[in-house]
Amino acid sequence: MTATKPLVILKETILAGESKTINMEIAKLHTMNKLKIPIIVERSKLDGPTVLFTACLHGDEINGTEIVRQLIVQKINKPKRGTIICIPIINIFGFINKTREFPDGRDLNRVFPGSKTGSLASRFA
């Protein structure tokens, strides 16, 4: 069975059999440099499940980042069926600052499912 429905993430369309890196802009630093998080999407031509690998939900817990990186480098993230999405660093703020929390002092793991009008961490969730 072939995959027929395109996948849309952040207004980017990923077709069956396609690979794409989407850079999600999440903020601007005081230097006006854009802060982006890469989302690596690999799709098979065949239908199947969608699997998401993430790491660094807490910015000071970085071991998972290397695991996700190895999945990508070794091409383990190329699915035979379905879609694999990799996000090596979720909490880029905490990662840069070597801290668990977002700049607003909140633990991202405690604000799911989030809110469009909430704190920075809540909006991100």
Listing of model-derived features with the role each one plays in the protein:
Residues 1-125:
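Structured catalytic-domain cores with a bias toward divalent-metal coordination
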